């Protein structure tokens, strides 16, 4: 164990103001709520000096831990293996796929040398050429490609570039005859077109069938790409290739609802333009449809309001003529597929693939024009099925697979690909070919090979435990096979629990390296608020039932100790974004000694003010509105920053945040650490905040070196807090 000294109370001075906000409570009337750290919401010289002092303290503590450098070396080695995506055949006659040699900060987009599906056993560089290398966008790794889409005819490539991980990005366009590689940059050739589409955020790129342009969502120009003011006045626009952004058509904007955001899609045959409207992050949206003629997208579009009330989630799958197939949770919390015939004045909704009561329909794609590939999530394990054009289930694919799956295909092609991964499955690409003999249609295209780890040395199991209110909760437990369940191991417990997002099995060489190095286990409970069991599971952990999310997470740790999966006091918890709220709320609510360490990353801590910054107003559907008295009464007791006790020993805590996070603004983390340090200044365990003052984003897109350092700091802190000895399990 690395020797690290800690002197309680050695924190930077944090000014406390007499600022008080007043809220209305349905049960108590007017409630004054002190906010002594309200000044940390601003961007001032005082805040800058405070963040520097806090960051320096955290770094000085981490620098004492010699294990961190050793972990960084191990993590870097464990990440050094080839990674790849499923290939896609475009209309230019080439296959395209992403490939990463191992430690590249961003995967490189390759293009096949020949029209045939590449034989990847010969090596990616032998069967393909670099088409687009995002690593050359900025020498220091500060620019990243966050999204890309090819035009339907395969002639254009549109890609969005973000700087320092920020949510705002700019779309550029290039011809597919103009690759971007290390070689082209060395020759001083960029090759992109003049198109420059700015202020792109929370959207995708939707090409029209004629390949003349694309739709996208943008926000009004602002002085700074990131900031804390609310996101408002989004607009869905159409950009024609070869024109300026000033010439773009505003396809839709609702000035009466400036907080709403939009999505769009076009039908495979180019006949329909679909517009989605969202008022928040709830699984409910409007669906409008417009018919396009030979002139394509133009001003003054006439919209048919097919769904004009926020009652359910609607997501277009495809259309066969005027018959549109939609994945929805309308009267089906586990989701189903319906059809609507747009040729009728009063479209009738018909079930196509009915809801399954014990499995959530997670993804549906149309394949080979008339078949449907569906992924169901049953007990947090993905199952893949093929359906006929009549909605009849034909077969199950990869029945022995346990993990998470995704589908990649183009509707008109006679094949589709599946990406399969799990806690100890680094990644397999499978192909289904409709033209092959039936017994040969499903095959493995390529499998990820990990260099420094043997995935077969690890195993994952699923257990069920009882939460505080008696609800049964599933939880995955991952371990190196040499680690015993005898009550001596440390446990890393990870969670999210919000926004109907499922905590699916995922492969992490860093986590497996930590488990192997320290003989620990990794636990992922499927807590309420997530989407593992459909919308009812989500509703069981949002707004007035949000307390269940924390109770489920705390009960998971107690179960691990009681059943000898973990040692008492050696459960460390980790989560990011909404998962950061989960971690902060759990250490505040749990009995003393439940957790040995906590690392909340970029989390929400002030539940009385979250809706006043950037996109936070969209989260009211998840957390509630503190301005409404009845909702204030259940929000206030859950808000982490307002419920830190002064008489309770807190676990070793390392909060991590990026100074320019434009999604969950850093004031949440700032206020929470200031409150912890003030309320329990003599806490025997460190209460620290690591602030990355060079990064804008919410945590995504960091260069490899920065990611490895962050991981080593986090896991090294946890190892020290739990008193773990660095070792290697043979």
UniProtKB/Swiss-Prot annotation:
* Catalytic activity line of the entry: Hydrolysis of Pro-|-Xaa >> Ala-|-Xaa in oligopeptides
Q: Which Pfam families match?
A: Peptidase_S9, Peptidase_S9_N
Q: Please provide one cellular component term from the Gene Ontology annotations of this protein.
A: cytosol
Q: List, from the UniProt record, the residues annotated as the active site of this protein.
A: 577, 661, 698
Q: Which residues form the signal peptide?
A: none
Record flagged with keyword Oxidoreductase:
no
Q: In the UniProt record, does the keyword Metal-binding occur?
A: no
Q: What is the effect of changing residue 661 to A?
A: Impairs catalytic activity but still binds both 35mer and 25mer substrates
Q: Which residues cross the membrane?
A: none
Alphabetized InterPro entries for the sequence: AB_hydrolase_fold, Pept_S9_AS, Pept_S9A_N, Peptidase_S9_cat, Peptidase_S9A, Prolyl_oligopep/macrocyclase
| EC numbers on record | 3.4.21.26
Q: Which controlled-vocabulary keywords does the entry list?
A: Hydrolase, Protease, Serine protease
**Residues covered by region (Disordered):** 1-34
User: Which PROSITE patterns would you find in this protein's record?
Assistant: PRO_ENDOPEP_SER (PS00708)
Gene Ontology BP term (one): proteolysis
Q: Which Gene3D superfamilies match?
A: alpha/beta hydrolase, Prolyl oligopeptidase, N-terminal domain
Q: What family does the database annotate? A: Belongs to the peptidase S9A family.
User: What quaternary arrangement does the UniProt entry report?
Assistant: Monomer.
* Function text: Dual function macrocyclase-peptidase involved in the biosynthesis of the highly toxic amanitin toxin family of macrocycles. Cleaves peptide bonds on the C-terminal side of prolyl residues. The enzyme first removes 10 residues from the N-terminus of a 35-residue substrate. Conformational trapping of the 25 amino-acid peptide forces the enzyme to release this intermediate rather than proceed to macrocyclization. The enzyme rebinds the 25 amino-acid peptide in a different conformation and catalyzes macrocyclization of the N-terminal eight residues.
Q: Could you tell me what this protein is called?
A: Dual function macrocyclase-peptidase POPB
Name the gene behind this protein.
Answer: POPB
């Amino acid at each position: 164990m690395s020797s690290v000294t800690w002197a309680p109370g050695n924190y930077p001075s944090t000014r406390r103001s007499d600022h008080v906000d007043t809220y209305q409570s349905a049960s108590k009337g007017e409630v004054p709520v002190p906010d002594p750290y309200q000044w940390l919401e601003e961007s001032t010289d005082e805040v800058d000096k405070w963040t520097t002092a806090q960051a320096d303290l955290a770094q000085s503590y981490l620098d004492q831990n010699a294990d961190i450098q050793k972990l960084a070396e191990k993590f870097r080695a464990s990440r050094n293996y080839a990674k790849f995506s499923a290939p896609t055949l475009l209309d230019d006659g080439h296959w395209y796929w992403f490939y990463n040699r191992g430690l590249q900060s961003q995967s490189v987009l390759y293009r096949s040398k020949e029209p045939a599906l590449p034989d990847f056993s010969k090596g990616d560089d032998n069967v393909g050429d670099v088409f687009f290398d995002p690593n050359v966008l900025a020498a220091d790794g500060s620019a990243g490609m966050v999204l890309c889409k090819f035009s339907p005819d395969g002639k254009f490539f549109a890609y969005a570039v973000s700087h320092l991980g920020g949510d705002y990005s700019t779309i550029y366009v290039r011809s597919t005859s103009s690759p971007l590689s290390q070689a082209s940059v060395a020759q001083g050739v960029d090759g992109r077109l003049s198109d420059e589409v700015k202020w792109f955020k929370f959207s995708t790129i939707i090409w029209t069938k004629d390949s003349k342009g694309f739709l996208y969502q943008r926000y009004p120009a602002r002085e700074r790409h990131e900031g804390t003011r609310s996101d408002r006045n989004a607009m869905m626009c159409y950009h024609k290739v070869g024109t300026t952004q000033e010439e773009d058509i505003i396809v839709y904007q609702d000035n009466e609802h400036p907080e709403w955001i939009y999505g769009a899609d076009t039908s495979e045959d180019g006949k329909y333009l679909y517009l989605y409207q969202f008022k928040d992050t709830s699984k409910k949206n409007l669906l409008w449809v417009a018919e396009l003629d030979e002139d394509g997208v133009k001003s003054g579009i006439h919209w048919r309001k097919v769904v004009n009330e926020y009652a359910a989630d609607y997501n277009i799958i495809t259309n066969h003529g005027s018959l549109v197939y939609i994945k929805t949770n309308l009267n089906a919390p586990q989701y189903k597929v319906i059809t609507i015939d747009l040729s009728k004045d009063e479209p009738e909704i018909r079930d196509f693939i009915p809801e399954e009561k014990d499995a959530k329909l997670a993804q549906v794609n149309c394949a080979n024009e008339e078949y449907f590939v569906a992924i169901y999530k049953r007990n947090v394990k993905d199952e893949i099925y093929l359906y006929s054009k009549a909605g009849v289930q034909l077969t199950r694919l990869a029945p022995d697979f346990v993990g998470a799956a995704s589908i990649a295909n183009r509707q008109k092609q006679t094949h589709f690909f599946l990406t399969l991964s799990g806690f100890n499955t680094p990644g397999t690409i499978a192909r289904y070919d409709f033209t092959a003999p039936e017994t040969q249609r499903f095959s493995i295209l390529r499998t990820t090979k990990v260099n420094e780890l043997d995935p077969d040395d690890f195993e994952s199991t699923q257990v069920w435990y009882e939460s505080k209110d008696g609800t049964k909760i599933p939880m995955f437990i991952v371990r190196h096979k040499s680690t015993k369940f005898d009550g001596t191991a440390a446990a890393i417990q990870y969670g999210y629990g919000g926004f109907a997002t499922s905590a699916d099995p995922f492969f992490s060489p860093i986590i497996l390296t930590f488990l192997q190095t320290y003989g620990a286990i990794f636990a992922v409970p499927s807590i309420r608020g997530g989407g593992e069991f459909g919308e009812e599971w989500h509703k069981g952990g949002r707004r007035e039932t949000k307390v269940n999310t924390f109770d489920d997470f705390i009960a998971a740790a107690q179960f691990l100790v009681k059943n000898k999966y973990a040692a008492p006091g050696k459960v460390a918890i980790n989560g990011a974004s909404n998962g950061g709220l989960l971690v902060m709320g759990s250490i505040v609510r749990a009995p003393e000694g439940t957790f040995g360490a906590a690392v909340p990353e970029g989390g929400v801590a002030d539940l009385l003010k979250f809706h006043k910054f950037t996109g936070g107003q969209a989260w009211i559907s998840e957390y509630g509105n503190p301005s409404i008295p009845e909702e204030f009464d259940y929000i206030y007791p859950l808000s982490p920053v307002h419920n830190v006790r002064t008489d309770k020993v807190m676990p070793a805590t390392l909060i991590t945040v990026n100074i320019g996070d434009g999604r969950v603004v850093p004031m949440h983390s700032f206020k929470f650490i200031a409150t912890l340090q003030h309320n329990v200044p003599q806490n025997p365990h460190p209460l620290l905040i690591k602030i990355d003052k060079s990064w804008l984003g919410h945590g995504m897109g960091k260069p490899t070196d920065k990611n490895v350092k962050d991981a080593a700091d986090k896991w090294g802190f946890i190892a020290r807090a739990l008193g773990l000895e660095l070792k290697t399990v043979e």
